[in-house]
Amino acid sequence: LDPQTLRVLLRIAGALLAVLGHVYPVFAGFRGGKGVATGAGAIILIAPGAALFSALGFVLVLGLTGIVSAGSITAALILPVAVALGAAGRPVSAWLLGFAIFLALFVVYTHRANLGRIARGEEKAFEKLRFLRGRRK
């Protein structure tokens, strides 16, 4: 492996282990978070340009709906597209694209209960976060 590929692989491996450790922590009975914040932090370090596009998607959906999980899922789904289009700021790495796809699918998987609540109209919306459209009275 060339040094650049090795650097990317090591970053991805660290990010993958951090996300999995957050979602399935050994000392908390393998019940943790949903991996969004940890994954976002990792992507900021690995592919800051792609992270920016994902963050914009998060803010847009959060501002429209007030639903954090919808923003998180949107950001995750934007990530592989942003990486594929070169927003990572470097030539598209198959390893990075693969990790972005995995992370997107994993975030959707960890939010499956939230998706059910969204579909039923039961997911909690934070009205104060709905800054892009009028507040409900």
Predicted regions and their residues:
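Helix-coil boundary and interhelical linker segments in multi-pass alpha-helical membrane proteins
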Residues: 1-13, 44-51, 85-98
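Short, hydrophobic/aliphatic alpha-helical segments
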Residues: 13-27
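Hydrophobic/aromatic positions within or immediately flanking transmembrane alpha-helices
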Residues: 11-15, 69-72
